[in-house]
Swiss-Prot record:
The keyword NAD applies. NCBIfam families: PRK02318.2-5, PRK02318.2-6. PROSITE patterns: MANNITOL_DHGENASE. InterPro entries: 6-PGluconate_DH-like_C_sf, 6PGD_dom2, Mannitol_1_phos_5_DH, Mannitol_DH, Mannitol_DH_C, Mannitol_DH_CS, Mannitol_DH_N, NAD(P)-bd_dom_sf. The keyword Oxidoreductase applies. Belongs to the mannitol dehydrogenase family. It comes from Thermoanaerobacter sp. (strain X514). The lineage of its organism: Bacteria, Bacillati, Bacillota, Clostridia, Thermoanaerobacterales. One of its GO terms (molecular function) is mannitol-1-phosphate 5-dehydrogenase activity. Its EC number is 1.1.1.17. One of its GO terms (biological process) is mannitol catabolic process. NAD(+) binds at A4, V5, H6, F7, G8, A9, G10, N11, I12, G13, R14, G15. This is Mannitol-1-phosphate 5-dehydrogenase. Keywords: NAD, Oxidoreductase.
């Protein structure tokens, strides 16, 4: 049986990546920092993926085990034996994962000659490159030559909504997911064979990454931040609000126009994709909380992420990103008390002022047109919804 090692045994790891790897015939070893989660996986040796739709389905994933990330002996054996290594740990953790992999790959080099593909499955642009660079930058010439010859680092675009929904479970590690998924993999970077059921191998990954980042992730964040302002608990409630749905649809139109010009994608294809995204948001079975989708606003409002990137692209090609900027402005009003990044943004606004805070988070110059438009929309939204 093929063997996979997956870093990150959370909901995405189990409900999306692990699920597809299992359906593709892999025996999966999850690696995680949570001792409790590792113990649960090793205790049950299986879990169920609950697919949320009109007729709820349940699919079992088995042939699994787990290793704690500090268990170097067993993790080393797993990496040596692996046919594929994947991650869903958050882009901020990829560098440290890459540094951990160096020693394990050196042991693999000394023991086995078969190729290996390593893929970061994260909501970030070309995330696998982060892993690859962190591995190569500390290697000697011989190790670098081995990595370049024997290890593939395909970038990926991944998409599946995995909410923290309260649903009856057989096992505590069961996970609920939406029916839709998409996993696009950079074909030219694969070494050897790579067969994952349901994944699509593509020649040019950038259009797929940006389409998903702008039209799904950007629209999701906009729905969450506006939904939070209007007092909605769930995404499916927020997207049914005419005011919110109009802004989200219009920001998708702006981003689609920019994508069409940059990548020569047919506008009809982008319209169909955007429409499908809105339909997914309306799924009432997901019960996806706006505070989950809006969490970590410092990251989501940063220069190369889901809102600022399409806004800047629009501006550079002469499109006014009016509705994308509403989403960004709403993000600076996201003051959820249990989110450390949201609290830090609000503290910075109080201590240093709105313009300096927006500049710090987004990377925009304080006197730039885009920043000043964000300020205007921030004040407009605050006046409309916060009356304080």
């Amino acid at each position: 049986m093929l063997k996979a090692v997956h870093f990150g045994a959370g909901n995405i790891g189990r409900g999306f990546i692990g699920y597809l790897l299992y359906k593709s015939g892999y025996e999966i070893t999850f690696v995680d920092i949570s001792k409790e989660l590792v113990e649960s996986i090793n205790n049950y040796k299986r879990y169920n993926v609950i697919i949320l739709k009109d007729n709820v389905e349940k699919e079992e994933v088995k042939n699994i085990k787990a290793i704690h990330i500090e268990d170097e002996e067993n993790l080393s054996k797993a990496i040596v034996d692996a046919d594929i290594v994947t991650t869903s740990v958050g882009a901020n953790n990829l560098k440290s994962i890459g540094e951990k992999l160096i020693n394990y790959l050196k042991i693999r080099k000394a023991n086995i000659d078969k190729p290996l593909n390593i893929m970061a499955c994260e909501n970030a642009l070309f995330a696998t490159n982060i892993l690859k660079n962190s591995i190569l930058e500390k290697g000697d010439r011989d190790f670098i030559e081995y990595v370049n010859q024997k290890i593939g680092f395909p970038n990926t675009a991944v998409d599946r909504i995995v909410p923290n929904v309260d649903i009856k479970k057989e096992l505590p590690i069961d996970v609920a997911v939406e029916d839709f998924y998409e996993w696009d993999i950079e074909k030219k970077a694969i070494i050897g064979d790579l067969n994952i059921r349901g994944a699509e191998l593509v020649d040019d990954l950038e259009p797929y990454i940006e389409r998903k980042l702008f039209l799904l992730n950007g629209a999701h964040a906009t729905t969450a931040y506006l939904g939070y302002l209007k007092g909605y608990k769930y995404i499916h409630e927020a997207i049914e609000d005419d005011f919110i749905r109009n802004i989200v649809s219009r920001m998708q139109e702006e981003a689609s126009l920019a994508l069409s010009r940059k990548h020569n994608i047919k506008k009809d294809d982008l319209e169909r994709y955007a429409s499908k995204v809105i339909k997914r948001f309306k799924n009432p079975y997901l019960k996806d909380e706006v505070v989950r989708v809006g969490r970590e606003p410092t990251r989501k409002l940063s220069v190369n992420d889901r809102l600022m990137m399409p806004a800047k692209l629009c501006y550079e090609i002469g499109i006014t990103p009016e509705f994308i900027l509403y989403g960004i402005a709403a993000g600076f009003l996201f003051d959820y008390k249990e989110d450390p990044q949201a609290c830090k943004i609000q503290d910075d606004i109080k201590n240093f002022g709105l313009e300096k805070t927006i500049s710090k988070v987004t990377g925009l110059e304080e006197n730039s047109d885009l920043l000043q438009e964000i300020v205007k929309k921030y004040k407009e939204l605050k006046e409309t919804f916060r009356k304080r």
